[in-house]
Amino acid sequence: MMSPLHSSWRTGLLLLLLFSVAVRESWQTEEKTCDLVGEKGKESEKELALLKRLTPLFNKSFESTVGQSPDMYSYVFRVCREAGNHSSGAGLVQINKSNGKETVVGRFNETQIFNGSNWIMLIYKGGDEYDNHCGREQRRAVVMISCNRHTLADNFNPVSEERGKVQDCFYLFEMDSSLACSPEISHLSVGSILLVTLASLVAVYIIGGFLYQRLVVGAKGMEQFPHLAFWQDLGNLVADGCDFVCRSKPRNVPAAYRGVGDDQLGEESEERDDHLLPM
Protein backbone atom coordinates (compact mmCIF):
# COMPACT_ATOMS: atom_id res chain seq x y z
CA MET A 1 0.00 0.00 0.00
CA MET A 2 1.39 3.43 -1.04
CA SER A 3 2.17 5.76 1.86
CA PRO A 4 0.49 9.23 2.01
CA LEU A 5 3.91 10.92 1.93
CA HIS A 6 4.91 9.15 -1.27
CA SER A 7 1.56 10.01 -2.92
CA SER A 8 1.89 13.69 -1.96
CA TRP A 9 5.42 13.79 -3.38
CA ARG A 10 4.27 12.37 -6.72
CA THR A 11 1.38 14.85 -6.88
CA GLY A 12 3.72 17.78 -6.24
CA LEU A 13 6.15 16.58 -8.91
CA LEU A 14 3.31 16.23 -11.42
CA LEU A 15 2.07 19.76 -10.69
CA LEU A 16 5.61 21.14 -11.09
CA LEU A 17 5.97 19.36 -14.43
CA LEU A 18 2.65 20.75 -15.67
CA PHE A 19 3.66 24.26 -14.57
CA SER A 20 6.98 23.99 -16.44
CA VAL A 21 5.19 22.89 -19.62
CA ALA A 22 2.73 25.78 -19.33
CA VAL A 23 5.54 28.32 -18.89
CA ARG A 24 7.42 26.92 -21.87
CA GLU A 25 4.30 27.05 -24.03
CA SER A 26 3.67 30.66 -23.03
CA TRP A 27 7.24 31.56 -23.96
CA GLN A 28 6.87 29.91 -27.32
CA THR A 29 3.55 31.54 -28.11
CA GLU A 30 4.77 34.98 -27.03
CA GLU A 31 5.69 36.83 -30.21
CA LYS A 32 9.23 38.13 -30.39
CA THR A 33 9.97 41.75 -31.14
CA CYS A 34 12.93 43.96 -31.99
CA ASP A 35 15.94 43.82 -29.71
CA LEU A 36 18.17 46.86 -30.07
CA VAL A 37 21.93 46.41 -30.35
CA GLY A 38 23.56 47.07 -26.99
CA GLU A 39 23.25 46.06 -23.37
CA LYS A 40 19.79 45.07 -22.20
CA GLY A 41 18.11 47.81 -20.22
CA LYS A 42 20.44 50.53 -21.51
CA GLU A 43 18.91 51.06 -24.94
CA SER A 44 18.74 54.52 -26.47
CA GLU A 45 15.53 56.34 -25.59
CA LYS A 46 15.46 57.79 -29.10
CA GLU A 47 15.67 54.33 -30.69
CA LEU A 48 12.91 53.02 -28.43
CA ALA A 49 10.72 55.98 -29.39
CA LEU A 50 11.31 55.30 -33.10
CA LEU A 51 10.37 51.63 -32.70
CA LYS A 52 7.20 52.66 -30.91
CA ARG A 53 6.49 55.03 -33.79
CA LEU A 54 6.60 52.08 -36.20
CA THR A 55 4.16 49.98 -34.13
CA PRO A 56 1.33 50.25 -36.74
CA LEU A 57 3.56 48.27 -39.15
CA PHE A 58 4.22 45.33 -36.81
CA ASN A 59 1.33 43.25 -38.16
CA LYS A 60 2.05 43.98 -41.82
CA SER A 61 4.19 41.99 -44.25
CA PHE A 62 5.93 43.41 -47.32
CA GLU A 63 7.17 41.43 -50.31
CA SER A 64 8.97 42.27 -53.54
CA THR A 65 10.23 40.02 -56.35
CA VAL A 66 13.18 40.81 -58.60
CA GLY A 67 15.10 39.10 -61.40
CA GLN A 68 14.11 36.53 -63.98
CA SER A 69 14.08 32.76 -63.84
CA PRO A 70 16.27 30.98 -62.86
CA ASP A 71 17.75 33.95 -60.93
CA MET A 72 14.46 35.19 -59.49
CA TYR A 73 14.37 36.14 -55.83
CA SER A 74 11.61 37.25 -53.51
CA TYR A 75 12.30 39.42 -50.46
CA VAL A 76 9.93 39.35 -47.48
CA PHE A 77 10.20 42.07 -44.83
CA ARG A 78 8.43 42.62 -41.53
CA VAL A 79 8.96 45.25 -38.85
CA CYS A 80 9.98 43.59 -35.57
CA ARG A 81 8.19 40.37 -36.48
CA GLU A 82 9.12 36.97 -37.93
CA ALA A 83 9.36 37.10 -41.73
CA GLY A 84 10.70 33.59 -42.32
CA ASN A 85 9.26 30.11 -41.89
CA HIS A 86 11.64 28.75 -39.25
CA SER A 87 11.11 31.01 -36.19
CA SER A 88 14.72 32.11 -36.30
CA GLY A 89 14.06 35.80 -35.59
CA ALA A 90 14.41 36.71 -39.26
CA GLY A 91 13.08 40.18 -39.99
CA LEU A 92 14.00 40.10 -43.70
CA VAL A 93 14.53 36.99 -45.81
CA GLN A 94 15.50 36.21 -49.40
CA ILE A 95 13.70 33.31 -51.11
CA ASN A 96 15.12 31.68 -54.23
CA LYS A 97 12.11 31.12 -56.49
CA SER A 98 13.75 28.27 -58.39
CA ASN A 99 14.48 25.98 -55.41
CA GLY A 100 12.64 27.65 -52.50
CA LYS A 101 15.83 28.15 -50.49
CA GLU A 102 15.40 30.75 -47.76
CA THR A 103 18.30 32.99 -46.75
CA VAL A 104 18.08 35.26 -43.72
CA VAL A 105 19.27 38.74 -44.71
CA GLY A 106 18.82 40.24 -41.24
CA ARG A 107 17.40 39.39 -37.82
CA PHE A 108 15.39 41.74 -35.64
CA ASN A 109 17.17 40.63 -32.46
CA GLU A 110 20.07 42.82 -33.68
CA THR A 111 18.26 46.02 -34.63
CA GLN A 112 19.52 49.54 -35.12
CA ILE A 113 17.29 52.48 -35.98
CA PHE A 114 17.78 56.21 -36.51
CA ASN A 115 16.03 58.95 -38.43
CA GLY A 116 16.17 62.35 -40.08
CA SER A 117 13.58 65.00 -40.81
CA ASN A 118 11.66 62.88 -43.36
CA TRP A 119 13.14 59.40 -43.23
CA ILE A 120 13.82 56.45 -40.90
CA MET A 121 16.68 53.99 -41.33
CA LEU A 122 16.00 50.49 -39.97
CA ILE A 123 18.94 48.06 -39.87
CA TYR A 124 18.75 44.31 -39.20
CA LYS A 125 22.08 42.62 -38.49
CA GLY A 126 22.94 38.99 -37.77
CA GLY A 127 21.84 37.46 -41.06
CA ASP A 128 23.18 34.24 -42.59
CA GLU A 129 26.88 34.26 -43.44
CA TYR A 130 28.08 34.88 -46.98
CA ASP A 131 29.52 31.87 -48.77
CA ASN A 132 32.40 33.49 -50.65
CA HIS A 133 31.97 37.26 -50.26
CA CYS A 134 32.65 39.93 -47.64
CA GLY A 135 35.00 37.76 -45.61
CA ARG A 136 32.11 35.39 -44.92
CA GLU A 137 30.60 37.85 -42.46
CA GLN A 138 26.92 37.85 -41.55
CA ARG A 139 24.49 39.52 -43.89
CA ARG A 140 22.89 42.83 -43.00
CA ALA A 141 19.67 44.50 -44.22
CA VAL A 142 19.30 48.28 -44.42
CA VAL A 143 15.73 49.52 -44.99
CA MET A 144 15.31 53.20 -45.88
CA ILE A 145 11.75 54.32 -44.98
CA SER A 146 10.93 57.60 -46.71
CA CYS A 147 8.14 60.04 -45.94
CA ASN A 148 4.92 59.69 -47.94
CA ARG A 149 1.90 61.26 -46.25
CA HIS A 150 -0.53 59.44 -48.59
CA THR A 151 0.15 55.88 -47.43
CA LEU A 152 0.76 54.03 -44.18
CA ALA A 153 3.30 51.75 -45.86
CA ASP A 154 3.90 50.86 -49.51
CA ASN A 155 6.43 50.49 -52.34
CA PHE A 156 8.83 48.09 -50.64
CA ASN A 157 11.64 47.41 -53.13
CA PRO A 158 15.23 46.17 -53.08
CA VAL A 159 17.69 48.80 -54.31
CA SER A 160 21.09 47.12 -54.38
CA GLU A 161 23.41 44.65 -52.69
CA GLU A 162 26.84 45.87 -51.66
CA ARG A 163 29.10 42.82 -51.46
CA GLY A 164 32.24 44.01 -53.22
CA LYS A 165 33.97 44.86 -49.95
CA VAL A 166 35.91 42.80 -47.45
CA GLN A 167 33.49 43.71 -44.65
CA ASP A 168 30.44 45.85 -43.82
CA CYS A 169 28.46 44.55 -46.79
CA PHE A 170 24.71 45.10 -46.83
CA TYR A 171 21.45 44.78 -48.75
CA LEU A 172 19.71 48.12 -49.31
CA PHE A 173 15.91 48.39 -49.49
CA GLU A 174 13.48 51.29 -49.66
CA MET A 175 9.81 51.84 -48.86
CA ASP A 176 7.35 54.69 -48.26
CA SER A 177 5.42 55.42 -45.09
CA SER A 178 3.63 58.33 -43.49
CA LEU A 179 5.19 57.27 -40.17
CA ALA A 180 8.53 58.63 -41.38
CA CYS A 181 7.12 62.14 -41.86
CA SER A 182 7.74 64.91 -39.37
CA PRO A 183 4.65 66.33 -37.67
CA GLU A 184 3.11 69.14 -39.67
CA ILE A 185 3.49 72.51 -37.93
CA SER A 186 1.01 75.16 -39.01
CA HIS A 187 2.40 78.70 -39.10
CA LEU A 188 0.19 81.78 -39.17
CA SER A 189 1.02 84.29 -41.86
CA VAL A 190 1.70 87.94 -41.07
CA GLY A 191 -1.71 88.89 -42.48
CA SER A 192 -3.45 86.33 -40.26
CA ILE A 193 -1.64 87.63 -37.18
CA LEU A 194 -2.64 91.21 -38.01
CA LEU A 195 -6.28 90.20 -38.53
CA VAL A 196 -6.38 88.32 -35.23
CA THR A 197 -4.79 91.27 -33.43
CA LEU A 198 -7.20 93.74 -35.03
CA ALA A 199 -10.23 91.59 -34.19
CA SER A 200 -9.05 91.30 -30.58
CA LEU A 201 -8.60 95.07 -30.27
CA VAL A 202 -12.05 95.73 -31.75
CA ALA A 203 -13.63 93.23 -29.35
CA VAL A 204 -11.88 94.82 -26.36
CA TYR A 205 -12.93 98.30 -27.52
CA ILE A 206 -16.61 97.38 -27.96
CA ILE A 207 -16.95 95.31 -24.77
CA GLY A 208 -14.92 97.72 -22.63
CA GLY A 209 -16.74 100.77 -24.01
CA PHE A 210 -20.13 99.14 -23.52
CA LEU A 211 -19.38 98.33 -19.88
CA TYR A 212 -18.03 101.84 -19.24
CA GLN A 213 -21.06 103.54 -20.79
CA ARG A 214 -23.49 101.31 -18.90
CA LEU A 215 -21.84 101.07 -15.49
CA VAL A 216 -20.04 104.42 -15.18
CA VAL A 217 -21.98 106.84 -17.37
CA GLY A 218 -25.31 105.10 -16.82
CA ALA A 219 -26.30 105.13 -20.49
CA LYS A 220 -29.24 103.13 -21.80
CA GLY A 221 -30.16 101.65 -25.15
CA MET A 222 -28.06 102.69 -28.15
CA GLU A 223 -26.22 105.25 -26.05
CA GLN A 224 -24.31 102.38 -24.44
CA PHE A 225 -22.31 101.98 -27.65
CA PRO A 226 -18.94 103.76 -27.23
CA HIS A 227 -18.51 107.02 -29.19
CA LEU A 228 -21.96 106.67 -30.74
CA ALA A 229 -22.01 110.19 -32.20
CA PHE A 230 -18.70 109.59 -33.98
CA TRP A 231 -19.86 106.33 -35.55
CA GLN A 232 -23.17 107.88 -36.60
CA ASP A 233 -21.33 110.67 -38.40
CA LEU A 234 -18.67 108.36 -39.82
CA GLY A 235 -20.37 108.13 -43.21
CA ASN A 236 -20.38 111.90 -43.66
CA LEU A 237 -16.77 112.12 -42.56
CA VAL A 238 -15.76 109.45 -45.07
CA ALA A 239 -17.68 111.20 -47.83
CA ASP A 240 -16.01 114.54 -47.02
CA GLY A 241 -12.61 112.89 -46.96
CA CYS A 242 -13.23 111.16 -50.29
CA ASP A 243 -14.43 114.42 -51.81
CA PHE A 244 -11.37 116.24 -50.51
CA VAL A 245 -8.96 113.62 -51.85
CA CYS A 246 -10.61 112.81 -55.15
CA ARG A 247 -11.98 116.17 -56.44
CA SER A 248 -10.13 117.61 -59.42
CA LYS A 249 -11.07 121.29 -59.13
CA PRO A 250 -11.89 123.77 -56.37
CA ARG A 251 -15.42 123.91 -55.08
CA ASN A 252 -16.00 127.61 -55.84
CA VAL A 253 -15.17 127.75 -59.54
CA PRO A 254 -15.70 131.25 -61.05
CA ALA A 255 -18.36 131.27 -63.73
CA ALA A 256 -17.27 131.57 -67.32
CA TYR A 257 -19.70 134.50 -67.81
CA ARG A 258 -20.96 137.39 -65.75
CA GLY A 259 -24.46 138.74 -65.52
CA VAL A 260 -25.23 142.24 -66.75
CA GLY A 261 -27.03 144.61 -64.41
CA ASP A 262 -29.87 146.95 -65.35
CA ASP A 263 -27.71 149.97 -64.72
CA GLN A 264 -25.31 148.75 -67.36
CA LEU A 265 -27.98 148.59 -70.02
CA GLY A 266 -28.31 151.80 -72.02
CA GLU A 267 -31.63 153.34 -73.06
CA GLU A 268 -32.55 152.01 -76.44
CA SER A 269 -33.77 154.40 -79.02
CA GLU A 270 -37.36 153.86 -79.98
CA GLU A 271 -36.87 155.66 -83.29
CA ARG A 272 -35.25 152.61 -84.97
CA ASP A 273 -38.57 150.82 -84.83
CA ASP A 274 -40.73 153.67 -86.06
CA HIS A 275 -40.63 152.46 -89.65
CA LEU A 276 -42.26 149.26 -88.60
CA LEU A 277 -45.39 151.03 -87.44
CA PRO A 278 -48.34 151.12 -89.86
CA MET A 279 -48.72 154.38 -91.70
Curated annotation (Swiss-Prot):
Residues covered by the MRH domain: 32-183
Keyword list, A-Z: Disulfide bond, Glycoprotein, Lysosome, Membrane, Phosphoprotein, Receptor, Signal, Transmembrane, Transmembrane helix, Transport
UniProt signal peptide: 1-28
Any Pfam family: Man-6-P_recep
Positions glycosylated per UniProt: 59, 85, 96, 109, 115
Membrane topology (Lumenal): 29-187
PROSITE patterns attached to this UniProt entry: MRH (PS51914)
Membrane protein topology class: Single-pass type I membrane protein
Chief subcellular location: membrane
Transmembrane region(s): 188-213
Location of the protein in the cell: Lysosome membrane
Family annotation (InterPro entries): Man-6-P_rcpt (IPR028927), Man-6-P_rcpt_cation_dep (IPR000296), Man6P_isomerase_rcpt-bd_dom_sf (IPR009011), MRH_dom (IPR044865)
GO molecular function, one term: protein domain specific binding
Positions of modified residues (Phosphoserine): 269
Disulfide pairings: 34-80, 134-169, 147-181
Subunit structure: Homodimer. Interacts with GGA1, GGA2 and GGA3.
Additional observations: This receptor has optimal binding in the presence of divalent cations.
Known role: Transport of phosphorylated lysosomal enzymes from the Golgi complex and the cell surface to lysosomes. Lysosomal enzymes bearing phosphomannosyl residues bind specifically to mannose-6-phosphate receptors in the Golgi apparatus and the resulting receptor-ligand complex is transported to an acidic prelyosomal compartment where the low pH mediates the dissociation of the complex.
Entry domain remark: The extracellular domain is homologous to the repeating units (of approximately 147 AA) of the cation-independent mannose 6-phosphate receptor.
Name recorded for this polypeptide: Cation-dependent mannose-6-phosphate receptor
Natural source organism: Bos taurus
Gene: M6PR
